[in-house]
């Protein structure tokens, strides 16, 4: 409860930021899938700290170890796939003050209120380190979707603070465009300005947020389980469960509410192959909670990192007023590292719904 | 799968727009709750069609019948509570053309693609009629939350098309303010302009959308189950499962991404009673996925109604190009009737998490 | 929680023995299944009280009404199928004393202890009346299994008190053999003695139990989800959730523990069609938690009916000693009516696992 | 799906018999439980191979490592507790023939039929080695039940082949009695004969089965969730998911069907403390699916070990007739090592239902 996600393609993550390690069990993966452990590691490398000067300087190898579920390390058995990443480079000293003073807008105070206890340092389960299990599992989901349906999932940074990339075409953008720079914005001129902004804000001891966009190209048609497990509903939950998220949009999103029905509706076009085809894609690839085969497009708002070096007002665990200045090594902006996290969560939703659709609607 | 929602306080809805009826089973409701069936009916009356001239003129009594789970019609037994509303006033003729031509941005085409079959008329499960079960169940959740924790849930229309109410204080607004006008916007001067806009757009045979805001006052502290069932994640899923939703925000939302961490963080204040208290509420009442006791504030984007009287390009079920003009009796704007739906979905999430928190964290 | 069963083919039952009605929602049924409502009613007729002089003389028509999920009353839409049976012929007076004195070995005392409240009469959810929803849903599962895989499910009474039928061949017995007599034992000579025994014990104001056997012929191969949702584990749970059950066996069962491995093992035989074939079937059609295609054979122990006319020692709800003699119209032996219940629960397990297998293992 | 068990206190196991290791994640454990890792290891030691001359001579240390969920290695955080045991002492050579010839009454053939692939050696997930995760998780459940409700769970061998212990009093038997001999039968004279029987049958290259009995003393009252998650139904599923089980009984079990209602009913006795008390315990501590506070007593049938040294008829993976004689190091009788497995599964069910009862019925 709470640390598991999905119904048929189901993952369970474990691990605190400091302790033996973090990891995940992937349950329900179809048997006889060719699985590349290198691809899993590659996704983890996109997520890991210390990958560039605009991320936290913490150095962690984040080497994944697959404990079960594979034959010869390359073919799924249909049994649970357990993956573990050992914790390294621990400096609990960094977090000493934090154990006493509650970090504003962080999870310290609420974990204490909920559980009456909490991990002594580093954010415990609320640390971004927890997302390792998600990214590793998401890498498997991606390979499943690719092999079963030719589906591609790609995310990128669309806005940092108030610097927005407006020329990206979700139909065409490639992984190499995204990975071409350290901020993961495929519009290179804008990316440069984003990096400068992150540097500047980081120098102030402050932080910033922004917006990540994600596209699913060639999704299977018919995914989504009305009325509660509509595809957009499960996507919303998936990304809103990532740390630091504040908003979710699909297709036309909040701006779409400014249009009239006649402007917003996506006219159906005749197609040669019987697939549904629409003139516009305000629906974002999902209608009535079910994928129609057009690209699925979502956007996710990430707030500025809560932990900053600037001194802030807060209280300590006795409820007394105090001040706090973060001493840990934190990202001034989480978005570059959050790109693979968003892709992973989207992949997990799609993989789960692929199997659910297969379960209910493929008998005849 | 798909028609059930919640873990411990769990609902399952059933019913097409045309057929024997629609309804819901509520499972897991605590025993010995004083339940007012009148309050359930009152919520359904806020949702029902024909309640004002800016909603669909369809007349449906939507009278709820409670089949099980109550002693003397007023106290819960702890067993499943089944509620049914019979379908009335059916005019399947209205939908005749729609069975052939797929309505743009509606669910006809995707239901057909997914299931290979669909209800012959009226939208089937994709009809807003399905939300009757949600609203009835939400009314029970509200009473549970009120009696167990003194929690209040209130939603209202914040924006219609581009007319926005900017002076509403989520801490103070009352149900009577919301119900004071037919558009359910508590700022009366703005409400008047909203009604005029809906009338004007309706006369054009077109439709419009907007934004609903919802507050939870006096939520229990500690609700939310990291890392996947964070409270905001479950809220996002809950409201994004409502028909016509395109976006979700909590607290500072998308706008919050324009702030720096030092501006966005909510400083903790010393409090007399040991409860957490923050100087600002950019977090929207949830930190680290767990409620901190401050008001929970969310916003939901609703697109313009898909079915309009204006003629539109589309295809028929054979894939041939055709045009379609909606002849049914539809809302030119769903928001006034969606207000109780949003409250219901929020109440269901809170009730479920209250029981989940009780289950895991109240033994000692 | 508690009133739902299954994962993909999932049912939720509701209703007390007295009140508005009882029923069930079936979620996840594949679309485009030809469904005969008459067949559902036929199963309910096998279950209903008053069907013969050895069952309770209560007369209830138990007429099922399908509220949703069907097109033209005969084809599934893939959406939830809700079925309701109205309660009739209520004589709450019969149960007056029982509201005060706890019936020994019945659920009165434990429901009160658990919930702190209970239905005022008739056993509430603990009544056999609750099984109506199971049998109706099971009838759908049977039709699904028949159409998808040619699977047949058949149960019968194997023992009443100490009168046992020993000549039944699970491979060959037919529904007509079972329905040939009122006790539902396909060995007619033994059946006669069983009826006499039930009559005799009933005349004493007492009751008796026995054993029901059930076979699944032509099950799909590969059903069952190790390691916890092994097919026999889910079958055990399914039938042990029926009222009055005390034991479950599969294949060789308890007697099989008296054999040595060399005697108990089922040798595999070469087969022409690639299907698995075994020389014996001590496994009862399931190996390693997975169906091997051989007939699945289980047995279920039912205790003597708890409510009897004979006076018994007990306590009242204040904890004071008292005596009680049942005045309601109860079955002296539940087994004849439990036969369709066992079939229904077995069908529900198989249908669910068929979809689960389809979901995980049919992509390529 | 399939490798997870429980709703609120939920475990997910992973790992093949050969590979990186086996383990479990325990989700939903209440925070602030004092947890002894030594006690977990002690339970694993009762389960491990090589513990006596009547078990398999494989030597495995089965040393548990706790990766997450604990503060200072002794207090639960309320977050997932991950535990891993590394695989050692692998001799895949032993299983070479088995990869080709299907072992009769083992899981080789059905895993192949279901998944189209299987672990190359040692039984994969079907190996008893998988139960390590269950026993480790069960040890946590035991500590939870003890601290929260004073509950004790104890199992023992009641019968081996046809040698039965008939003088054991479930109310009084102690762990030390069970652990006093290597066969884990608390009746020492009978135990001696059981050991001799196992030795004799083992010398023949054959195997034997038997019956394990288990008692829960001082269970919380009110556990169990009618109508499907009755406590006995979940217990049945729990133990029937263990390898080699063929039957389950509660209380009077199959023999109880030979009694009349007047003989079988458990008369309620007045009690001083308001707790329910019964004159007899044919119900086995559960009535209407809910614990009444009396000891819960169950029995489980285990078949003779499938893998034997004697030559047997079978087929190979091409469907051709062949013979097979087990060469691996296997237990001639699984029961001594299965005792802690039964206790673990029972503890997991009770812990889960304790939290579920707390969740629904403890708000007021």
Curated annotation (Swiss-Prot), chains A, B, C, D:
Cleaved signal peptide residues: none
GO CC, one annotated term: cytosol
Residues noted as binding NADP(+) in the record, renumbered to the chain: 47
Keyword annotations of the record: Amino-acid biosynthesis, Aromatic amino acid biosynthesis, FAD, Flavoprotein, FMN, Lyase, NADP
GO process annotations (BP): amino acid biosynthetic process; aromatic amino acid family biosynthetic process; chorismate biosynthetic process
Reactions accelerated catalytically: 5-O-(1-carboxyvinyl)-3-phosphoshikimate = chorismate + phosphate
Enzyme class: lyase
Domain of life: Bacteria
Residue sites binding FMN per the record: 125-127, 288, 303-307, 329
EC number: 4.2.3.5
Family note: Belongs to the chorismate synthase family.
Role summary: This reaction introduces a second double bond into the aromatic ring system.
Name of the protein described by the UniProt record: Chorismate synthase
Organism, scientific name: Synechococcus sp. (strain CC9605)
Gene: aroC
């Amino acid at each position: 409860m709470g640390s598991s996600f999905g119904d048929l393609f189901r993952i369970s993550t474990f691990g605190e930021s400091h302790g033996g390690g973090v990891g995940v069990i992937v349950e329900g993966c179809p048997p006889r899938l060719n699985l590349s452990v290198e691809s899993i590691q590659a996704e983890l490398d996109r997520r890991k700290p210390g990958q560039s000067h605009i991320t936290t300087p913490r150095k962690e190898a984040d080497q994944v170890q697959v404990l079960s579920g594979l034959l010869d390390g390359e073919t799924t058995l249909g049994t649970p796939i357990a993956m573990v990443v050992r914790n390294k480079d621990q400096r609990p000293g960094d977090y000493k003050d934090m154990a006493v003073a509650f970090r504003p807008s962080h999870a310290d105070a609420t974990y204490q209120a909920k559980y009456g206890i909490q991990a002594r340092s580093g954010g415990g389960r609320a640390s971004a380190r927890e997302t390792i299990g998600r990214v590793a599992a998401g890498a498997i989901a991606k390979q499943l979707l690719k092999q079963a349906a030719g589906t591609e999932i790609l995310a990128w940074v669309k806005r940092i603070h108030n610097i927005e990339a407006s020329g990206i075409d979700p139909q065409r953008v490639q992984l190499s465009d995204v990975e071409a720079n350290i901020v993961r914005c495929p519009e290179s001129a804008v990316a440069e300005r984003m990096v400068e902004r992150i540097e500047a804000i980081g120098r102030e001891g402050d932080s910033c947020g922004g917006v990540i966009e994600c596209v699913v190209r060639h999704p299977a048609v018919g995914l989504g389980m009305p009325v509660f497990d509509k595809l957009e509903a499960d996507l919303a939950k998936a990304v809103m469960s990532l740390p630091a998220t504040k908003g979710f949009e699909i297709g036309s999103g909040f701006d779409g509410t400014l249009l009239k029905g006649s402007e917003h509706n996506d006219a159906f076009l005749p197609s040669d192959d019987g697939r549904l085809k629409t003139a516009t894609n305000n629906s974002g690839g999902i209608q009535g909670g079910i994928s129609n085969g057009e690209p699925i497009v979502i956007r996710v708002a990430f707030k500025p990192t809560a932990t900053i070096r600037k001194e802030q007002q807060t209280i300590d665990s006795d409820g007394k007023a105090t001040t706090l200045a973060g001493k840990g090594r934190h990202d001034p902006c989480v978005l570059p590292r959050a790109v693979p996290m968003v892709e992973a969560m989207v992949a997990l939703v799609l993989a789960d719904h692929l199997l659910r659709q297969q379960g209910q609607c493929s008998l005849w």
